[in-house]
Amino acid sequence: MSILSALTSISNPMKSSKSSVANGGGRLSMGSNSVACGSCGGGSSSSGTINNADGSKTTYYTYTSPIYTYNYSYSYSSSGSSSSCGCH
């Protein structure tokens, strides 16, 4: 499975959706994408960051129950991250 399809495939939006970015030593670019996580309750929020090769950090998603919003374009070399929306 490619990184892009791993990030964008969601089998059931009422279950926990997970995303991961593996070390690919390359560039990944996306526009924006919002998906409903569903049944998470109110007031929950989080965000995920990528550690860039130059030491900076890039926020690659924000989550405010029940919506995940991806909006990013970044390059990376040896860093990765994974996250889940926290629905149980």
UniProtKB/Swiss-Prot annotation:
A Pfam family the protein falls into: Coiled
Segments of this protein annotated with the region Disordered: 1-26
Biased composition (Polar residues): 1-14
Record-level GO BP terms: sorocarp development
PANTHER family: HSSA/B-LIKE PROTEIN 1-RELATED-RELATED, HSSA_B-LIKE PROTEIN 1-RELATED
Protein family per UniProt: Belongs to the hssA/B family.
Protein name: HssA/B-like protein 9
Upper lineage: Eukaryota, Amoebozoa, Evosea, Eumycetozoa, Dictyostelia
Gene that specifies this protein: hssl9
